[in-house]
Amino acid sequence: MQWYRFYCVVHDRIISGEDLKAEDDAAAIRAVRERDTGYDCELWAGDRRVATIPAEGEPIRF
């Protein structure tokens, strides 16, 4: 298990952030999607950006 942090973003400003623990990158992306924040989110593992997860549509993985 690995720790991740995701940030919800509006107009390039962070409006919230939350830690989560997941088995791998794919599981972390699913966990963010399941939260259905209604905002675009960025998922990070330490200083590595894992994905940008739009409010609608498919995640963009890095």
Tell where the protein language model's regions lie, with residue ranges.
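Short aromatic-glycine-(Arg/Gly/Cys) micro-motifs in beta-strand/loop hairpins
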Residues: 1-15
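Extended aliphatic helical segments
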Residues: 9-10, 32, 50
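Local beta-strand/beta-hairpin segments that build beta-sheet-rich folds
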Residues: 15-17, 50
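Short, mixed-charge low-complexity intrinsically disordered segments
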Residues: 38-62
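Generic intrinsically disordered, low-complexity segments enriched for polar/acidic and small residues
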Residues: 1-4, 36, 59
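A short, charged, amphipathic alpha-helix used as a generic interaction element across diverse proteins
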Residues: 24-40
